């Protein structure tokens, strides 16, 4: 036992010595640099927070034992050149890491120096998304990248249903790169930046006003403002003067606004009045213990600050505080891994010679790569929440508060997180649940928008540039009821035009427009070329009989269809005379066969049920066969003479007569239709038979039917013939394929209906083989298409759409076209139509026969017992057993064929004969039971 104690003591001594050696190997102080701009709001807060963090770390024995952080701070005063010089000064004095800079633009330059000298550059405010760890490995962003902020803004735009936005931003790396990221995120959501309005850093009030005037002339009323606080506040002041912070506008400012407002002890009411209804974002931080401790002693920290100004703690101050702790944890791990603070000359700098340049003072941090690795491996709970990096070098769990500026303060209306999107529940609560970013879960509280309204801004208006939107209309030469252009006056009219004008008049805002004809006035134009004019910006919209098809929806947006359409087959037809065998046409062959079989089945079933009790169903076999046929078919006319006496027989007859009544009524109605309505026939039965044949097919010039037949259905181009007018339709069909015409025409239903109204001798065969409609075409993501769709639905609901239809097309045109549609199997009834009736009747027959058979077997068993009791005993041999079965079958069939009354009479006679001879049988007497069986008594 003492030996074990000695070993344990030796082990503890060795560990203590090793630890002492490890600690003693650490330097007494580690030099770190920090760069701020005290003339900025973020810089003032961050400077105090960094000093507080250094003091807390140096007074904490659990972190960096035996080593103190030696902080050296420089004030760049937002001067980029000065910031670069100060960074060089840090690197001349063996600095292991630099906290800062504030500016993304400065960070781009300093990151190159950090990469060369292996000094980690840890910035808590450089949010430019292009400052990636791939290009700048020694740049460490200790705040949330603008990549996530722009994702949050894009989610806001999608949540409110806006498709176009205008961006105003400062024209530097910070502004340009963030807006570029926003554009990428919006495109993923089928939205876009309509207009980008940059302004130079330090722009004057007049310059910003000029930018805003251009923005006001754009159609988008959703404005994203990404700027520095100084210039951003000027934007709001000038926008208020121009009336741009009013009803109809929606403003979203990035987190620069909250970074300016949050530190303010007293919010300036005059300043807030310039941004009423603005939405902005704020970095979301959890309520951690370290955050509470820092907030509670903030006022004391301000007294120690040399600035003597009062301001509150902001989220950037929390990130600055966590940055120092992040570096401390990394240095602790660095020393624990055996790292040493040492520097060596950069051989590349030795090759550069220059008077007055002290380049040899710049040295490479030998342990920089190891320290960088330890920084990326930190994992602790800081003032902002969990501090940890993902594989891309970004802090985990990026989140923002969505803040609304209203009245004299700020109101949080929701949250955004990369985990669950928009929500009214805090992100740290949602982290405990499975991720869910469905549309139903994306929620925010109500927002009061500019103009003090709770109604969400529409987000766009027509641009205030005095220009009208150009609307292309097809200059048709046929079917001009739908759309036509007067060659003399240039007036555009037709059903499509009236629908468009009626829909435009329902909009809540004016739409300046003018119609521009498209075509050569000799033949119908190509509608595909007309749609392409929208893509090339020759037209702002297309109005006409434009079919909504898949290929077109990929390049333009369509409104709600205002006319239903679809491709049909039109062909010549011949009259079909009724003929002498017309009475057979109401039923199909299968229906005739099944009906005839059921007549025979019913006759047979009734004969089986009535044969033993009804003399009308007895007699010689020939007579019985005739009776079965006569009885079954006479039920067709309800003229059967034979009386049914059994209950089961009557049950079957009742059901069968009901079936006969239905069949007879249907037959009469169908035959009447066949004999009184003109029947038409055609060798073409629909699109399938048309494709498989080799006959030529006509189509309308300019229609999509040509491409559909050739590309989708595989019809050879040599079979397709272009036709330009109803007259050409009629002529081609009259000639037929043998004389240079066509066998059929494939076109859209509205045109065919109009053609059939004037030419009733033709007909549509088969059914529509495509389903589509006509709509108005607009550029992709055009908000006008959405509003017009709503207006078209309103026209349909209030009946105006039908009234416009009746104005241009005859009211009875539809009924005429429907009457001209050809059914290749008119009014013929199939078995399927009566399957339920036949099934019920069949089940009734089976049920009746089952009961009848059970009753018959029961009667036979009693009869056999009376006739020969020994026959019921089992036979001894196989031969006798076979004879017994044959005799039993013959006996049963004989019994089933006999009249039931005869069997009862014979049983009674036998019973009375046995009773009369009772005196000579040794006192044995027999009595007859009520059921015809006999019992013996001694």
From Swiss-Prot:
Superkingdom to which the source organism belongs: Eukaryota
Region annotation (Disordered) ranges: 906-938
GO CC annotation: plasma membrane
Reported tissue expression: Expressed at low levels in roots and leaves.
Mutant phenotype after disruption: Plants are defective in root elongation and show reduced mitotic activity and increased cell death in the root apical meristem (RAM).
Induction: By abiotic stresses.
Signal sequence, start to end: 1-20
Subcellular location: Membrane
Keywords: Glycoprotein, Ion channel, Ion transport, Ligand-gated ion channel, Membrane, Receptor, Signal, Stress response, Transmembrane, Transmembrane helix, Transport
Bias kind Low complexity: ranges: 922-938
Membrane spanning residue stretches: 589-609, 619-639, 651-671, 831-851
Residues with attached carbohydrate: 22, 39, 59, 340, 418, 436, 551
Record topology, Extracellular segments: 21-588, 672-830
Keyword Glycoprotein attached: yes
Annotated family: Belongs to the glutamate-gated ion channel (TC 1.A.10.1) family.
Name this protein carries in UniProt: Glutamate receptor 3.1
Gene from which this protein is expressed: GLR3.1
């Amino acid at each position: 036992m003492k030996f074990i104690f000695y070993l344990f003591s030796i082990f503890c001594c060795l560990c203590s010595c090793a630890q002492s050696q490890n600690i003693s190997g650490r330097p007494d102080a580690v030099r770190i640099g920090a760069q701020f701009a005290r003339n900025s709001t973020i810089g003032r807060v961050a400077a105090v927070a960094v000093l507080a963090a250094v003091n807390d770390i140096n007074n904490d024995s659990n972190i960096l034992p035996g080593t103190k952080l030696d902080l050296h701070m420089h004030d760049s005063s937002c001067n980029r050149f000065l910031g670069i010089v100060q960074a060089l000064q840090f690197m001349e004095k063996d600095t292991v890491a630099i906290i800062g800079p504030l500016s993304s633009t400065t960070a781009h330059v300093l990151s190159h120096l950090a990469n060369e000298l292996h000094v980690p550059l840890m910035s808590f405010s450089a949010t430019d998304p292009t400052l990636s760890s791939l290009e700048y490995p020694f740049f460490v962003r200790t705040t949330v990248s603008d990549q996530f902020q722009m994702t949050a803004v894009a989610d806001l735009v999608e949540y409110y249903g806006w498709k176009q936005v205008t961006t105003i931003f400062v024209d530097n790396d910070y502004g340009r790169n963030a807006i570029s990221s926003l554009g990428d995120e919006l495109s993923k959501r089928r939205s876009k930046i309509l207009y980008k309005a940059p302004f130079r850093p330090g722009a004057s009030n007049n310059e910003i006003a000029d930018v805003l005037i251009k923005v006001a002339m754009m159609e988008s009323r959703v404005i994203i403002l990404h700027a520095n606080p100084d210039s951003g506040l000027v934007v709001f002041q000038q926008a208020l003067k121009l009336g741009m912070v009013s009803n109809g506008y929606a403003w979203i400012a990035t987190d620069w606004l909250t970074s300016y407002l949050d530190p303010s002890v007293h919010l300036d009411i005059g300043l807030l009045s310039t941004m009423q209804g603005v939405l902005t974002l704020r970095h979301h931080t959890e309520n951690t213990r370290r955050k509470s401790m820092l907030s509670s002693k903030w006022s004391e920290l301000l007294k120690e600050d040399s600035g003597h100004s009062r301001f509150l703690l902001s989220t950037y101050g929390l990130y600055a505080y966590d940055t120092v702790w992040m570096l401390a944890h990394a240095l602790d791990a660095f020393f624990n891994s055996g790292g040493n603070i040492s520097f060596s000359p950069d051989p590349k700098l030795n090759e550069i010679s220059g008077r007055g340049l002290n380049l040899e003072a710049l040295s490479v941090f030998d342990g920089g790569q190891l320290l960088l690795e330890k920084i990326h491996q930190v994992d602790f709970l800081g003032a902002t929440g969990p501090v940890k990096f993902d594989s891309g070098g970004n802090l985990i769990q990026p989140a923002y508060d969505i803040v609304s500026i209203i009245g004299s303060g700020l109101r949080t209306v929701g949250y955004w997180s990369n985990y669950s999107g928009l929500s009214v529940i805090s992100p740290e609560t949602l982290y405990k649940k499975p991720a869910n970013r469905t549309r139903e879960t994306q929620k925010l509280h109500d927002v009061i928008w500019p103009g003090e309204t709770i109604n969400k801004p529409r987000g766009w208006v027509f641009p205030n540039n005095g220009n009208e939107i150009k609307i292309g209309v097809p200059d048709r030469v046929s079917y001009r009821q739908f759309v036509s252009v007067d060659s003399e006056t240039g007036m555009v009219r037709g059903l499509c035009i009236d629908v468009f004008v009626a829909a435009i008049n329902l909009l809540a805002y004016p739409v300046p427009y003018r119609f521009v004809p498209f075509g050569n006035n000799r033949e119908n134009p190509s509608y595909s070329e007309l749609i392409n004019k929208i893509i090339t910006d020759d037209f702002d919209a297309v109005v006409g009989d434009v079919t909504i098809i898949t290929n077109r929806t990929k390049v333009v947006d369509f409104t709600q269809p205002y006319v239903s359409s679809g491709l049909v087959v039109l062909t010549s037809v011949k009259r079909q005379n009724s003929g002498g065998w017309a009475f057979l046409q109401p039923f199909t062959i299968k229906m005739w066969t099944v009906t005839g079989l059921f007549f025979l089945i019913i006759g047979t079933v009734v004969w089986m049920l009535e044969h033993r009790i009804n003399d009308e169903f007895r007699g010689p076999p020939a007579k019985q066969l005739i009776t079965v046929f006569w009885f079954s078919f006479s039920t067709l006319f309800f003229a059967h003479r034979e009386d049914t006496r059994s209950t089961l027989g009557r049950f079957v007859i009742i059901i069968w007569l009901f079936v006969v009544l239905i069949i007879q009524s249907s037959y009469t109605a169908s035959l009447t239709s066949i004999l009184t309505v003109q029947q038409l026939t055609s060798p073409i039965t629909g699109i399938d038979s048309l494709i498989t044949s080799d006959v030529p097919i006509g189509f309308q010039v300019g229609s999509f039917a040509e491409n559909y037949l050739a590309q989708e259905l595989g019809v050879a181009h040599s079979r397709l013939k272009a036709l330009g007018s109803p007259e050409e339709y009629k002529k081609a069909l009259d000639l037929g394929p043998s004389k240079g015409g066509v066998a059929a025409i494939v076109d859209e239903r509205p045109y065919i209906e109009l053609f059939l109204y004037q030419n009733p001798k033709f007909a549509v065969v088969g059914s529509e083989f495509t389903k589509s409609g006509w709509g108005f075409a607009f550029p992709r993501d055009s908000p006008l298409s959405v509003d017009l769709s709503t207006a078209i639905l309103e026209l349909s609901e209030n009946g105006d759409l039908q009234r416009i239809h009746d104005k241009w097309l005859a009211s009875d045109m539809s009924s005429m076209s429907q009457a001209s549609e050809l059914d290749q199997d008119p009014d013929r009834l199939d078995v399927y139509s009566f399957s339920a009736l036949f099934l019920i009747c069949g089940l009734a027959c089976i049920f009746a026969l089952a009961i009848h058979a059970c009753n018959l077997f029961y009667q036979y068993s009693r009869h056999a017992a009376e006739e020969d009791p020994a026959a019921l005993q089992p036979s001894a041999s196989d031969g006798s057993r076979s004879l017994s079965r044959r005799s039993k079958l013959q006996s049963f069939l004989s019994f089933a064929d006999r009249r039931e009354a005869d069997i009862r009479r014979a049983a009674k006679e036998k019973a009375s004969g046995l009773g009369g001879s009772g005196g000579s049988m040794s006192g044995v007497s027999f009595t007859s039971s009520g059921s015809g069986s006999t019992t013996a008594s001694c």
